[in-house]
Amino acid sequence: MDKIFVEEAVSELHTLQDMIRWTVSRFNAANLFYGHGTDNAWDEAVQLILPTLYLPIDVPPHVLNSRLTGSERLRIVERVIKRINERTPIAYLTNKAWFCGLEFYVDERVLVPRSPIGELIEAQFQPWLIDEPVRIMDLCTGSGCIAIACAHAFPDAEVDAIDISTDALQVAEQNIQDHGMEQQVFPIRSDLFRDLPKEKYDLIVSNPPYVDQEDMNSLPKEFKHEPELGLAAGTDGLKLVRRILANAAGYLTDNGILICEVGNSMVHMMNQYDHIPFTWLEFENGGHGVFMLTRQQLVDCASDFALYID
């Protein structure tokens, strides 16, 4: 960003509204990619600036006329510069992200929460769940956002939050503590199902790595800040999904279901396994590539994934 823009911003912008407007203009001029919780420059600016000032996202309109100190303007401008020059997602600049209306701590050890599964959680997985879940597994938990959101949606359920990454589990543990969920959400290190005891769950939810090699090679620069372990999944993006499909039935109750996100790799799933009765879920708020299978359906297609049993 040109030095003149920085000097003008610090010296001439006075109110919160001024700073938001300036940031939106700079973001539009920089042609940024939006895909980490927002889809436009205005929301991106708001979610950068308000947390930087230790303010809630939903401030009353009259607060927008508040004057900013010189140090506050400088701190905002520094983060705007990082967002533009380094293409750093704003969640990593503020260490804040939102999922299912809940706030989470995030840093570059975990992906920024953005899964459409949040819409399913808010609807309590209806009409797919037959019974109120007693035990839930969040497989590949990352920041723990899905596990914690499930715990809020089902306050009587125990939730196991599984991840292979000790770094990710440290972030998940922090979020579990921040939400006061230590007695309901339990972080566990495991390579998918490999290191888990054979216990039964009414619901397994998974947002595993699913980006195929072609997409990995063409991701916008913003995604380079995220851990590759949480994104890349082989040539067709199904490296981990096949293992999940091979093993999930052994961990589900009779009426249990698997909800799994595969994003753009949905195309590979449909081409390679067109005989499997995936229920591809639809979303009102955007998103795609999430399927549901019952335990019995997983049992019926077990032979397709026999090579991937842990």
Curated annotation (Swiss-Prot):
GO terms for cellular component: cytosol. GO terms for molecular function: nucleic acid binding; protein-glutamine N-methyltransferase activity. It comes from the Bacteria. GO terms for biological process: methylation. Keywords: Methyltransferase, S-adenosyl-L-methionine, Transferase. Its EC number is 2.1.1.298. CDD domains: AdoMet_MTases (cd02440). It catalyses: L-glutaminyl-[ribosomal protein uL3] + S-adenosyl-L-methionine = N(5)-methyl-L-glutaminyl-[ribosomal protein uL3] + S-adenosyl-L-homocysteine + H(+). Belongs to the protein N5-glutamine methyltransferase family. PrmB subfamily. Methylates large ribosomal subunit protein uL3 on a specific glutamine residue. HAMAP family: L3_methyltr_PrmB. PANTHER family: 50S RIBOSOMAL PROTEIN L3 GLUTAMINE METHYLTRANSFERASE, RIBOSOMAL PROTEIN UL3 GLUTAMINE METHYLTRANSFERASE. This is Ribosomal protein uL3 glutamine methyltransferase. It comes from Vibrio anguillarum (strain ATCC 68554 / 775) (Listonella anguillarum).
